[in-house]
Amino acid sequence: MPILEIKGPIDLNDPVLVIAISGWVDGGMVATRVGEHLKADGRLVAGFRPDDVFDYQSNRPSFELIDGAGTKIHWPSLTIDALKGDGSDVLVMTGNEPNAMWQEIADELAGFARTARVSKVVAVGAIPAMVAHTQETPIIVSSTDPALTPIGVPLGRLVVPAALVNVLSHQISDANGIPQVGFWAQVPHYVSGSYWPGVETVLNRLSAFLGLRVDLRGVHREATEMRSRLDEALANRPEAQQMIEELGQQASSLSPEDGANLTDEIETFLRDLGDDDTPFS
């Protein structure tokens, strides 16, 4: 029995599949927020059967209560929504990283992409890095097509633990012979919760790449407010300010060991502040 259920028509114009799911490479919840923002104007076209792909003891459903009364159970999901673009249409895969059946998910998604005539696959994610919130969010771009990779991207071999988004984008690209591009934001180690400046940067890059009109006013407002809260929290803490300024100035020239040490110092210092209202880890 297929684990991917079709929920609506998929008659689309030269669609691009964007994979933006929570999990291993979702630092600052950037992929989660990007996916939510993109699919807000979309329609559901497919979804994986939750009972087949999730272990509910580790990916638990949430129970919503209002004024003490239970109102709804929210189950983990992995779904695909469609939205109209100015040129190509867009399919957006969002949800939780499943606990099982990754290869079968990849195989069925590759078949779905073939049926929908997907022309490109775009993976979205974020990783904690030696960057400061005072900087523009750096983006790492990966691609199976050198023509789609900007000049200046480091070359060479790199082996890292794979997230489901890596598995899916690679196998769909490989099975169908279509290009795959990845946009990976680098977010500050020391910030907890959703990192809205990173969300804004990725949505800007993604909308330009897709030729998609995206209303970013709300996201820009969140990003501006978050930077202001971070600056205010540091205003009377010169030691933390100095550390973050040093991180911003030297991030590109620090050795991995020195950068890790500096980041550890910043994280420790900010955690020790003991202020529950600050947006620090």
What name fits each language-model region?
Residues 191-281:
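A conserved C-terminal secondary-structure "cap"
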Residues 130-213:
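Catalytic cores of processing enzymes, dominated by hydrolases/peptidases
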Residues 12-16, 87-90, 116-119, 134-136, ...:
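Short coil/turn connectors at secondary-structure junctions
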Residues 46, 91-93, 122, 179-184:
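Hydrophobic/aromatic beta-strand patches that form the interior of the parallel beta-sheet core
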Residues 50, 126-127, 188:
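Short, ordered loop/turn segments at secondary-structure junctions
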Residues 21-25, 93-102, 151-159, 189-193:
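Flexible, glycine/proline-enriched loop segments at strand-loop-helix junctions
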Residues 88, 96-147:
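Internal, conserved structured core segments that host functional sites
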Residues 1-95:
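N-terminal short beta-loop-beta anion/metal-coordinating cradle
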